Amino acid sequence: MNFPISLYIALRYWRAKSADRFGRLVTNLASLGIVLGVMALIIVLSVMNGLEGYQKQQVLSSIPHAIVSEEQPISTEKTLENLPHFVQKAVPINTTNVIYQTAKGVSAGQIIGIQSFSDDPLVESFDQTKFNEILPRGEFKLVIGDQLAQKLGVNIGDKIRLMITENSQYTPFGRVPMQRLFTVSDIYYGYGEASGYEAFANITDIGRLMRIQPQQAQGYRLFLNDPFQITELPQHFPTQKITDWRVQKGEFFQAVRMEKNMMGLLISLIIVVAISNIVTSLSLMVVDKQGEIAILQTQGLTKSQVRSVFIYQGLLVGFVGTLLGAILGVLATLNLTDIVSAVNPQGVFLPTELSFVQMIFVIGFSLLLSLLSTLYPAYRAAKVEPAAALRYE
């Protein structure tokens, strides 16, 4: 295989045992720093991706991704047509913020009116054929979460007073919130924090409290394949009002994303510091190899080829460090659960998600910095004059 002369000389310098032990030590430290930096950056970004995906699955699966509504209530028998490809389905919904009150406690939450158990992932495991038994129309019954039941101290068959602060009625004592007694007909379990504030009732019963006529609903609830595609909805529903999950959880996910970006920035500084050692090691090599550079120039090596020798030399250090760091980072990420279990056998769950695009960015970032770090030493090497360098040889 025919290598360019500059690459051939760079390979010889890279593999040769230098008499300058300090320069060799600096080069090895640069490679080690790049390995650790790239590995740490891939692991941290993968963990942050996993945590973001886990939070998206746990938090956003339990709340409406989006509600599309008109100026007037929509008919529950009418379907929403021309759905975007990223929308799984659309179902009628009545939902509002409420205050739950019992003799044993008070709690704020959200009530969702549904037509069947398949309308919400929190209760879709219930027997669909028993919907009219559990949430019959006109009987004002509720299905609540286990955490909410504990807060209010209620069980199946107990009464809960629901107060809707958004709607009110006038009485001789002034304006008071709409309220109604509901009976707990069943309890759902799990699903994180949602079971502490979300309850379900027949869509018609909630509509009555919201002053919506029977056979009508507040709007359509949309289920998206990816909740983060919510920004594409306005162009598909330009005339409708869209309320989405960002009202409730937008700040939380902005904080998660900012944390991921800041962690990536801080870890990337490790790579920057490590690659700065390439400048030092190449500068020492230029001083050490001045005589050889001069001899090569007298034998026909041009200044551009001299520059290429040291550019290749720095890129070799950066490439080897980046490649090893990427391999170790991927291996550590794939086995992170076992590693964490070995270090802390308390059953800690740490979700991870490797992103090919992020890996390419990390590798490209490391190689680009490696290239930039070679420019000054390569320029200094090309400035060596054979006559001056060989004057005392």
Swiss-Prot record:
The chain crosses the membrane at residues 25-45, 262-282, 314-334, 356-376. It holds the Pfam family FtsX. Keywords: Cell inner membrane, Cell membrane, Membrane, Transmembrane, Transmembrane helix, Transport. Disulfide bonds: none annotated. It is a multi-pass membrane protein. One of its GO terms (biological process) is lipoprotein localization to outer membrane. It is found in: Cell inner membrane. GO terms for cellular component: plasma membrane protein complex. InterPro entries: ABC3_permease_C (IPR003838), Lipoprotein-release_system (IPR051447), LolCE_TM (IPR011925), MacB_PCD (IPR025857). Part of an ATP-dependent transport system LolCDE responsible for the release of lipoproteins targeted to the outer membrane from the inner membrane. Such a release is dependent of the sorting-signal (absence of an Asp at position 2 of the mature lipoprotein) and of LolA. Belongs to the ABC-4 integral membrane protein family. LolC/E subfamily. This is Lipoprotein-releasing system transmembrane protein LolC. It comes from Haemophilus influenzae (strain ATCC 51907 / DSM 11121 / KW20 / Rd). The lineage of its organism: Bacteria, Pseudomonadati, Pseudomonadota, Gammaproteobacteria, Pasteurellales.
